[in-house]
């Protein structure tokens, strides 16, 4: 089926919505403001001001509207390297963040999430903000409310896979880059034909290093990608991604604790060594490896405790 997509101004979008009202469809896809069906063509208008025409008459129908549009204006100059565009917090953005990288137990968990300007008031009302000071119960409560309404993708690198990749010479930065890139790609596919105005990654490596890590990937997301530390405070999309990632991490943690029969602690401090030693004593080193990042110093410390 042929697809034609045009970008219109807000007034044209409203005019189209009224024009197609007699042909309107009751069900709207995510991000749509109207949907209609005429003989040989389906029309869907999105909040992003993109309008998609599908069907044998799609191109002809689209041309009727293209003829009414003012001339396209040239884009503003690109911003300086490392600087976010003006009014960035109000833009429609995919944000991505990760958790679990500093924890001996548990998987690295990455989430990419899309938040548009219209969704922001609701997300703020639901409690979405920088989650660093939040406790797990609050994280879980908010995540369960926002996951049905926020387009997102969560990817986990389970401990056995993590250990395998690490032994093959891959560092954490490389693993995170792969997960971020794929999670963002997944969200872009979910949103199509809508495109975000920007993508913001909570920075864990320099831009050049990040893309070097992805050099062998068949698909690399580069367009409109920005990197910033403390990105949770710069856009709600990163705050939402962080909350969802942590929720999934907590779920994985709870499942592992249930499986091994011991409450597993987060972090990588001395309290973690004691629990790891208990697992070695009860089940052996191989079992510990199923739930941990083996190259952490905690492994050797736990072995010493277990031998006492």
Swiss-Prot record:
Residues given in the record as a divalent metal cation binding sites = 97-98, 202
Cofactor(s) of this protein:
Mn(2+); Mg(2+)
Keywords in alphabetical order: Cytoplasm, Endonuclease, Hydrolase, Magnesium, Metal-binding, Nuclease
The broad enzyme category this protein falls into is hydrolase
Q: Does the keyword Hydrolase apply?
A: yes
- Do you know which Pfam families this protein is assigned to? DUF3378, RNase_HII
The protein's superkingdom reads Bacteria
Where it mainly occurs, coarsely classed, is cytoplasm
Q: Where is the RNase H type-2 domain?
A: 91-308
Could you tell me what reaction this enzyme catalyses? Answer: Endonucleolytic cleavage to 5'-phosphomonoester
What's the record's note on cofactor binding?
Manganese or magnesium. Binds 1 divalent metal ion per monomer in the absence of substrate. May bind a second metal ion after substrate binding.
Please tell me whether the keyword Nuclease is annotated for this protein.
yes
Gene Ontology molecular function terms on file:
magnesium ion binding; RNA binding; RNA-DNA hybrid ribonuclease activity
| Residues annotated as transmembrane | none
An example GO biological process term is: DNA replication, removal of RNA primer
Question: What does the entry list under GO cellular component?
Answer: cytoplasm; ribonuclease H2 complex
**Which EC numbers characterise this protein's activity in its record?**
3.1.26.4
Please give the CDD domains that the UniProt record associates with this protein.
Answer: RNase_HII_bacteria_HIII_like, RNAse_HIII_N
Compartments it resides in: Cytoplasm
* Family designation: Belongs to the RNase HII family. RnhC subfamily.
Q: What does this protein do?
A: Endonuclease that specifically degrades the RNA of RNA-DNA hybrids.
Protein name as it appears in the record: Ribonuclease HIII
- Taxonomy-wise, where does this protein's organism fall, top ranks first? Bacteria, Bacillati, Bacillota, Bacilli, Bacillales
Tell me the gene name: rnhC
């Amino acid at each position: 089926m042929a697809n034609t997509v045009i970008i219109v101004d807000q007034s044209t979008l409203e005019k189209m919505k009224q024009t197609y009202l007699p042909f309107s469809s009751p069900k709207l896809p995510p991000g749509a403001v109207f949907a209609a069906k005429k003989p040989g063509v389906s029309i869907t208008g999105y909040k992003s001001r993109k309008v998609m025409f599908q069907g044998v008459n799609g191109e002809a129908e689209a041309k009727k509207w293209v003829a009414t549009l003012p001339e396209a204006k040239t884009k503003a100059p690109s911003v300086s390297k490392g600087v976010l565009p003006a009014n960035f917090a109000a833009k429609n953005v995919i944000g991505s963040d990760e958790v679990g990288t500093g924890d001996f137990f548990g998987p690295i968990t990455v989430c990419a999430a899309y938040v548009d300007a219209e969704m922001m008031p609701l997300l703020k009302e639901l409690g979405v903000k920088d989650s660093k000071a939040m406790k797990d119960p609050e994280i879980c409560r908010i995540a369960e409310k926002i996951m049905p309404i926020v387009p997102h993708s969560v990817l986990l690198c389970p401990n056995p896979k993590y250990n395998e990749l690490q032994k093959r010479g891959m560092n954490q930065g490389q693993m995170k880059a792969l997960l971020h890139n794929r999670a963002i790609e997944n969200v872009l596919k979910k949103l199509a034909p809508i495109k975000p105005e920007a993508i913001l990654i909570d920075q864990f490596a320099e831009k050049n290093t990040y893309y070097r890590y992805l050099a062998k990937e068949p698909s690399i997301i580069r367009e409109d990608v920005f990197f910033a530390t403390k990105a949770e405070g710069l856009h709600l999309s990163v705050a939402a991604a962080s909350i969802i990632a942590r929720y999934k991490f907590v779920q994985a943690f709870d499942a592992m604790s249930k499986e091994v029969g011991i409450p597993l602690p987060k972090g990588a401090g001395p309290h973690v060594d004691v629990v790891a030693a208990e697992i070695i004593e009860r089940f052996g080193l191989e079992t510990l490896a199923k739930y941990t990042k083996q190259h952490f110093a905690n492994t050797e410390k736990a072995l010493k405790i277990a031998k006492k």
